[in-house]
From Swiss-Prot:
Pathway(s) served: Cell wall biogenesis; peptidoglycan biosynthesis
InterPro entries, alphabetized: FAD-bd_PCMH, FAD-bd_PCMH-like_sf, FAD-bd_PCMH_sub1, FAD-bd_PCMH_sub2, MurB, MurB_C, MurB_C_sf, Oxid_FAD_bind_N
Principal location listed in the UniProt entry: cytoplasm
Organism: Acinetobacter baumannii (strain SDF)
Protein name stated in the entry: UDP-N-acetylenolpyruvoylglucosamine reductase
Pfam families, per the entry: FAD_binding_4, MurB_C
One biological process term in Gene Ontology: regulation of cell shape
The gene coding this protein: murB
Required cofactor(s): FAD
One annotated GO molecular function: UDP-N-acetylmuramate dehydrogenase activity
Domain FAD-binding PCMH-type: 26-196
Active site: R173, S242 (proton donor), E338
Family: Belongs to the MurB family.
Amino acid sequence: MFKNRFFNTMQIQNQVQLKPFNTLSLDVTASHYTKVKSIEDIEEALAFAKEHELNVLVLSGGSNMLLPQQINALVIHLDIQGIDVLSEDQDFIRVKVGAGQVWHDFVLYTTKQNWFGLQNLALIPGLVGASPVQNIGAYGVEVGEFIESVQVYDRLLKQTGSISAADCHFSYRHSIFKDEPARYIITHVTFKLLKQANLKLNYGDLKQAVGDNLTAENLQNQVIHIRQSKLPDPKEYPNVGSFFKNPIVNTQEFERLIAQFSTIPHYPQANGNVKIAAGWLIDQAGWKGKQLGVVGMFHKQALVLVNYANASLADVKKTYQAVQHDVEQRFQIMLEPEPVLYNNLGLIENHTE
């Protein structure tokens, strides 16, 4: 039975099932749960957690997290809405977006408004507030390129603040929010988008699909089509999208790999390093379409781990660690998981522990 406690606008619930709120569909119960729609709600929730000596786990779209069966912590579920135009000129428009907005819906909205920049990131699961955390990226675009600033509640200073894109330290699947996960709760993200067409068509299959119809809408539609053809729908096949990061190796390491495996897909980076396609490594290690019990790597895209039937976190860990082992044996590369791993106290845990 739920026990509900009401504050000014916020409600705390006990023993709440989080299965609908994580895209891997893990069976998870939170000892304490609340949905927040404002900064005031966040302040009340944090005060409750402090009073009851609870850790805080901030839940966004649940598309990049691995959760245990029981979480003894306060889960704060972000639901801050709103899309507000701050300013615009001939070339740019600045838009402030609530952290609880669905990411894909926001991308569709920008295209409808004829704003450019985010079309390559269509159909990425999750909410706007999670996009800066791991600097989401796809088809040659990272969200950090179009973020002007991130609005936060700073738990250390106990106040709201704004962090410029430069101070977010965006890099491949990384940001300051990963370095200090317990400090900031993202409330809004301010984007600086283009008003003139500037389509990023760096990826071969995307360039070919877009063809001569160089509109934002066509680019977005082709990205959606390609993703849907390769990636499983989480409602049908529970997953967290790309499970592993594409490893980045130095020149010496790359020369060793290319000498042994001449067809290895790779992408040169600005600093002389080389990004390797993790999906190809997993496929070559024999894991594409392979299952270990109720968890496996998807048959159309080896980079996606799928929960086929009521898997537990232990089942998931057993599978991804087996994939890591086999890839390392073949290529001497240790794959790093993308989703964040939590323990039963709601704290982030290292995947290697």
